[in-house]
């Protein structure tokens, strides 16, 4: 039995519900078509990028198994030439198609992402899709990587109106990884979904994009009943420096259900840099909770009140908890101690770049401190005899906060005999050039 022309035209006009069979397959028997087309796509995939134009039409096939085989083939091939086809696949109404297309798009701009994305955890029962999201969500492309507008548009639309909550949450994660600023309205709308996973992924994406204009749209979640969502909202409020939310953060501190929420609220308040909160920071600097001591020190660091220097000096010398001591070192340096002696706070921060457990904390503090030209001048001499981890860590810091005076030092790292240092230096110099006018 062959397909009639009216049926073929109808399939084209309604491809969102029933994508059309590629013309070259239209005259084959219906029962045999599916298996033959699946095999055909698999055979094409082995030809690499040259097969992309031939595979793409199968994304509009009437049979889902064929469309899935096509998007899998595109994911496996990878590379910029698959982008247009994957954007088309992301518009499919099936959630698995949306998820596979999303991960494939991210993989183009962050090679290797398919191994860490949720695609490998997918399970399907009929139209129901289940996926396992990892708790680690710190990936983000380098700032010099350019992502075409249609990619961000389709991912934003999926985060707002995907076929399943899993595909929406996955798209929100992808928007964050790709720094999709244009999709912020979609992420803010996703915050109203009442689904904890989707709300959390949307908040983390907003954090990565770092657009302060999004701050007010997050404030309503500062008292959310789900602790994970509430903490993400608190962190986002601090990162985006939403000053209008300061009263809400103070209430959260007073009424926090857990110590973890209180710590995050004090930390977020510390990012807002309001002198009215100095008393709060001084109080928590001596708290028995090391996380609260750390947040108190960070708040005083950003206020830069000279009267707090002796208090922070004393706290730094007495502190034994690594996390809190790093925050106190940050505070002492912020208030003007730029010495680079063996036991000085600034040297302590640089030394901590060698610690796998606390490297990220040290990079964050040094990034903030290095916006001050005097701090940069203090650390430049260290780079000549630094360890590999110190060189790569400071390379990241200078990429984010350096200025023209940082170029010669990054140039030196680009020429470093250590391949790892050279690679990080090359990326960092490119990031710096992208940032600077």
Please give the residue ranges for each predicted region.
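Alpha-helical, heptad-rich or low-complexity scaffold/stalk segments
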Residues: 30-96, 103-107, 330, 427, ...
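Solenoidal tandem-repeat scaffolds enriched in leucines and small polar residues
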Residues: 132-139, 164-170, 174-183, 194-208, ...
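Alpha-solenoid repeat junctions
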Residues: 44-48, 74, 78, 105, ...
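Bacterial N-terminal signal peptides
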Residues: 6-14
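Amphipathic alpha-helical scaffolding segments comprising HEAT/armadillo-like alpha-solenoid repeats
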Residues: 18-28, 48-60, 79-91, 111-130, ...
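Alpha-helix N-cap/helix-start positions at coil->helix boundaries
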Residues: 34-35, 49, 64-65, 80, ...
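Terminal, low-structured helical/coil segments at or just beyond the last alpha-helical repeat
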Residues: 416-437
């Amino acid at each position: 039995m062959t397909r009639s022309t009216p049926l073929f035209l109808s399939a084209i006009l309604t491809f969102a519900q029933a994508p059309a069979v590629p013309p070259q397959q239209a005259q084959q028997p219906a029962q045999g078509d599916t298996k033959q087309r699946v095999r055909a796509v698999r055979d094409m995939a082995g030809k690499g990028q040259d097969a992309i134009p031939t595979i793409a039409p199968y994304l509009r096939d009437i049979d889902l198994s064929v469309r899935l085989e096509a998007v899998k083939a595109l994911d496996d091939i990878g590379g910029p030439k698959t982008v247009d086809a994957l954007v088309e696949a992301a518009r499919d109404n099936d959630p698995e198609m949306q998820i596979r297309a999303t991960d494939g798009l991210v993989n183009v701009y962050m090679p290797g992402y398919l191994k860490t994305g949720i695609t490998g955890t997918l399970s399907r029962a009929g139209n129901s899709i289940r996926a396992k999201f990892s708790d680690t969500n710190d990936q983000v492309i380098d700032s010099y990587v350019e992502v075409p507008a249609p990619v961000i548009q389709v991912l934003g639309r999926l985060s707002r109106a995907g076929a399943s909550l899993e595909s929406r949450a996955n798209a929100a994660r992808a928007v964050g990884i790709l720094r999709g600023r244009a999709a912020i309205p979609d992420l803010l709308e996703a915050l109203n979904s009442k689904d904890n996973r989707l709300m959390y992924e949307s908040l983390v994406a907003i954090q990565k994009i770092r657009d302060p204009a999004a701050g007010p749209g997050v404030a309503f979640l500062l008292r959310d009943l789900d602790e994970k969502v509430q903490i993400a909202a608190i962190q986002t409020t601090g990162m985006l420096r939403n000053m209008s939310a300061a009263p809400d953060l103070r209430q959260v501190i007073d009424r926090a259900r857990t110590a973890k929420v209180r710590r995050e609220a004090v930390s977020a308040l510390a990012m807002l840099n309001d002198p009215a909160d100095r008393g709060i920071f001084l109080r928590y600097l001596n708290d028995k909770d090391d996380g609260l001591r750390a947040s108190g020190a960070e708040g005083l660091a950003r206020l830069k009140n000279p009267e707090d220097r002796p208090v922070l000096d004393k706290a730094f010398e007495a502190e034994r908890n690594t996390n809190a001591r790093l925050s106190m070192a940050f505070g002492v340096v912020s208030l003007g101690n730029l010495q680079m002696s063996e036991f000085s706070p600034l040297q302590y921060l640089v030394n901590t770049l060698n610690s796998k457990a606390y490297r990220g904390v040290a990079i964050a503090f040094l990034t903030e401190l290095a916006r001050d030209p005097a701090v940069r001048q203090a650390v430049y001499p260290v780079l000549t005899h630094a360890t590999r981890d110190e060189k790569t860590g400071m390379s990241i810091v200078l990429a984010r906060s350096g200025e023209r005076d940082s170029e010669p030092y990054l140039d030196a790292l680009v020429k470093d005999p250590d391949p790892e240092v050279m690679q990080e230096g090359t990326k960092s110099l490119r990031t710096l050039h992208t940032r600077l006018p």
